[in-house]
Every structure is written in structure tokens, then in C-alpha cells.
């Protein structure tokens, strides 16, 4: 929907774009109501959502002709994560899990190649550890926005198509995690696309090299930035199904015992 707003602006449909932006805000406010939070928490979060909503509406104002460039695209795209991270952290807190939203743009430093920005890993690690490690050491779960970074001067960037996996790998690398779990809509990595081939078989175990070779052969396995980070830190990567969490999925690591299901 947010990317659709950018397209509407390109077409000069500013009023429709503004209506869509308001619909995004209303949707998140409705989700907030559904969470049934304690009054003080509800009111605080409602104010945060409305504040972000005003920022979103400012990007699609009717009285000024908006220049629709890659930088605006990234700013618009970022609002979904920034809103949902707050709601998810609140839901966790209400369920008894200490959690806070964290803006990845506060520590993921990137170049200014908007829509396909590359992270500056060393500086990202330093900044990320300063923010994330104290939270983790205090038993607080950081709910970090995905696929978003920022330039040195604070302009919002995104790291390209399907870069949420990459964001997760960066965060795992920053905190020196032993495991990274990628939640998707399939049961793991297959020998072929299971939607296209009845002969596709689920792979239970893969090495980094095997997963990389499969990706280079054209398989839509993981974002290409995930495996280099995982192999550098000997991190185990799991690919599992969000809708069937009881299944083991595929394990990618330094070594494996092999196996097609």
C-alpha cells in the first residue's frame, strides 16, 4: 500500500495518495484497538502512531507538488515497519515479554543509493552493539524495523527488494547470535520450486556453500547478503514456515549430515 502511494504520486493523484496514507494510519489505529492494551499504554502508543501518521501525511500533502524520487520512495516504504514495530513490541509487552521498538535507521549505516542501499558493516556493528546489547543484557527484546537504514546525515534508505532477510542477518551478526531463523511461507529450502514441480524435495541440511550454489543457480532461497554474514560468524541459519511452525525447516551451517527429506 505504501509503495502504491508512491505510484499514485508519480501519476499526480495526490488526493487519492493522501486518502491511501490516511487508510494506512487508520489500519494501524484499528490494530491498536484490537490489542486491548491498558489505557495508559494504549494512549501513549496512539499518540506515537498519530505522530508518525502526521509525518506520513506530510510526505503526501496536497498543496505542494511532490518530487517522487528514490529518496521519497524509501521514506514512504519505511512507515510500515516503523508503525508495526511499535504495535508488535506493545503486544509482546502486554503478553508479559519485555520488549521495545528499535529503529534500524538508528544504527544501520548505509550509502545513499536509495532503494538499494548497501550497509557499512563495521560502523553498523559498532552502533548496533551500543544500542542492542544493553537491551538484551537487561532481558528486553528489541523489535527492530526491517530493511531500513540511514545515510551518514540521517536520510532514510532501504536495502532493496526482499531485504528483510538481510536485515535479520545484519542484526544477528551485530549481536553475535549463534542462530538466525528466517520465517517464510514454505517449509524450508527445496531442490526445486515446490509450487512448480511435484518432484521438489525438502532439504533438511545444507552447508553455506551448497546454499550459495543453489542461489547462484537462480533459486530464490535467501537474500544474497545473508550467507556471507552467516559464514563469517559461523552462524546457523534456519529457514522455516511461519504458518507451520511445528516443522523443523532447513538448517544451513558450517557442516551438515546431508539430506533430502
Describe the function of each predicted region.
Residues 1-222, 226-227:
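Nucleotide/pyrophosphate-binding catalytic subdomain
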Residues 251-261:
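A conserved regulatory-domain signal marking ACT and ACT-like small-molecule sensing domains
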Residues 207-253:
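A conserved active-site cap/scaffold subdomain adjacent to cofactor or substrate pockets
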